[in-house]
Amino acid sequence: AKWNATLDATSLGSITRPSNSGTIVTDAVGLLNMYEYQSSNNGETNGYLNNGLYWWTLTPYSTSDVRFVYNNGYAHHNSPSYTDGVRPSINLKSSVRIVDGDGTIDDPYRLNGDNDTNLSGTLLSSRYSGEYIKFGSGENNLYRIVSHENGTGTKIVSAVPLKNSGSHIES
């Protein structure tokens, strides 16, 4: 997947889709950039990725500050030395299929894995942004669909920002 990490100090709601030039990170795992966050809420603050917690994005604001999402959904910037959460974003292959679930928080999609014998489920790439996926085992295994990457895969993001202390900054 590609994540555009080009510096952007534009106001939330005015951010345009990053081009394929600038600082591009190509990897299967990363952080969302500000454009992807803004796309989840049409430039407002009440989209499906705003859950009242602070979390970092991949987008630099300046040479010393990075953009983050404030607990009220607004975009801010600060030194990356602060302890805001991170939301891992993973790009899954376009061939991944849904085994069961309806995409809600109470019944998230479960994806096909090594132990599944029925691989005829719905392609994940046909589902909608904001729907829930249970991916992996243990804690922190709930994700949201963010986007489909031009036929190469589906980008998902952790439903809740992760912190190494095990707690979240709420105010």
What role is predicted for each listed range?
Residues 1-171:
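Collagenous Gly-X-Y triple-helix signature in extracellular proteins
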